[in-house]
Amino acid sequence: MCGIVGYIGDKQATPILLEGLTRLEYRGYDSAGIAILHNGNINIKKAKGRLNVLRELVEKDYMEGTIGIGHTRWATHGEPSDTNSHPHLSQSGLIAVVHNGIIENYLPLKKWLIEEGYNFISETDTEVVANLLEYYYNGDIVEALRKVLDRIEGSYALGVLCKDNPDMIVAARKEAPLIVGIGNGENFIASDIPAILKYTRNVYFLDDHEIAIIKKDSVEFIDVFGRKIGKSLFEVKWDVEAAEKGGYEHFMIKEIHEQPAAIKDTLRGRIINDSQIVLDNINITKEDLEKIEKIFIVACGTAYHAGVVGKYVIESFARIPVEVDVASEFRYRNPIVNERILTIVISQSGETADTIAALKEAKRKGSRVIAITNVVGSSVSREADEVLYTWAGPEIAVASTKAYTTQLIALYLIALDFALKKGTMSSTKVVEIISELKKLPDKVQYLLDNKEVIQKFASEHYNVKDVFYIGRGLDYAVAMEGSLKLKEISYIHSEAYPAGELKHGTLALVEEGTLIIALATQDDLFEKMLSNIKEVKARGGYVVAFAKQGNLQLEGVVDKVIYIPDTLKELTPVLTVVPLQLLAYYMAVEKGCDVDKPRNLAKSVTVE
């Protein structure tokens, strides 16, 4: 969840580092800092709070130098404070370190270093790394880093400066993202591509247990044993402008409006003759599918909600049992996984720590793993056996929108491919579903073009204290996502419930004026859903229902009906979620919330 940037070249490092950290704000942070190596000294400025606080410090006392490292911190060890902010210096000031991850054995290492005469000024695990590097340093910072990596346990992306080596940055990673950017007479390190995209499109992705030695005109990669490694250079295709707001007030609303294009891009090239599916490099045969006894879908947050939809459609289309698991729970319950289990992991960033851990656990137990991710070269994409990319483009807002809808598209494609190969769906039905899939971008655009009704409703109801989302079947899956969107960016208490469960306890919370969002798009469940709606209306609930165009049965029953374009029931989540995203957004705007960077949250959760 922290952000790392490093620069070495002929330009002043400070503005490049500050700009790079700005590009990483979406990852979430509570403090920031930079370290500049100049004239044999390492100068550090760091502060709790937003990057503007750090900028003010730098403006008062500018930091000269052409080599430096920067960091945005999300507290894990030690509260947010100036002292706990990164970069951290070793005791003598010889070495500066920035770190993303968690050093699990930092306490015994800290105790040992104290016994060796080292003092600590922060509560962080990162200062342990800095002092450990100094302890092992004997004129060779790379050798010292190798020895440190042999001692520390846990996850890390590290950027290191040593004032005895003013011509290099050294970096290493294990289970935390880190890239190396290649420029012309200048090179970079970063947690994510947007931080350096203004300066270079050519990057290397560090893998676990690798060390990078970065000079201004060369980069060398070695493993923890000191052996040289050859790596492939990756060219970033998307533009830096894709990570800008493009005239919208917030990234979130921009990304909501990008969904028609993102859906088209994710479908592009994967449908042949309107009747066949091509899943990139995924080659699961009919024989493979016959051996699969069960599918696990494993993910976190919004991606988990997409996985719940995936369960419905894979079971419906391909008739394979599916279990959806929260990644942070998956590996700790010793799941029954073997070579007859297929695991599908979903992660927008491809760097979600819990999802990566679950992926590795599934592979260790013999499962074949397919990853659905939005980031080429991410950890998830490299660890999985096969990958299906969602071509959503960079998603900057913490609250995920276009990544969710493209994850749904990816799951529909997988379900259709499996159904075709297993013969569980007629070719006529497949053609019908594919035809409707191709219509979704225009139908999403229709919802966006008619967003004023949502905006007006939000302006009238943003002061509510509680909102309950209810639905059945696929509508319940979407209700969970709608509820999450509302609570995470507007800070309004919200919960989602299966409508049939209301009478088992939740109905006690409904009183006069309680806002109920009722999703009623599933034709085969509509009558039961109508009964549930009447239950909450009878208790005084203010009900806003979402239904398909042409269904007039809710008129006069609920307080307000919002219509979505008609489509096949399996595809309704892609449409129903859009007005729910808009509702959350406009509620948050009305309340004056920080929409793109909600409190206490981060875009990419890279610690467990």
From Swiss-Prot:
Signal peptide segment: none
Assigned keywords, A-Z: Aminotransferase, Cytoplasm, Glutamine amidotransferase, Repeat, Transferase
Quaternary structure and interacting proteins, as annotated: Homodimer.
EC number(s) stated in the UniProt entry for this protein: 2.6.1.16
Lineage: Bacteria, Bacillati, Bacillota, Clostridia, Thermoanaerobacterales
Keyword Aminoacyl-tRNA synthetase (UniProt): no
Record domain Glutamine amidotransferase type-2: where: 2-217
All residue ranges annotated as the SIS domain in the record: 285-424, 453-598
Catalytic residue list: 2 (nucleophile), 603 (for fru-6p isomerization activity)
Top EC group: transferase
Record's catalysed reaction(s): D-fructose 6-phosphate + L-glutamine = D-glucosamine 6-phosphate + L-glutamate
Residues that span the membrane, as ranges: none
NCBIfam families in alphabetical order: glmS (TIGR01135), PRK00331.1 (NF001484)
GO BP annotation list: carbohydrate metabolic process; fructose 6-phosphate metabolic process; protein N-linked glycosylation; UDP-N-acetylglucosamine metabolic process
MF (Gene Ontology): carbohydrate derivative binding; glutamine-fructose-6-phosphate transaminase (isomerizing) activity
Main location: cytoplasm
Compartments reported by the entry: Cytoplasm
Record InterPro entries: GATase_2_dom (IPR017932), GFAT (IPR005855), GFAT_N (IPR047084), GlmS/AgaS_SIS (IPR035466), GlmS/FrlB_SIS (IPR035490), Ntn_hydrolases_N (IPR029055), SIS_dom (IPR001347), SIS_dom_sf (IPR046348)
Protein name, as recorded: Glutamine--fructose-6-phosphate aminotransferase [isomerizing]
Gene3D superfamilies, per database record: Glucose-6-phosphate isomerase like protein, domain 1, Glutamine Phosphoribosylpyrophosphate, subunit 1, domain 1
Protein origin, superkingdom: Bacteria
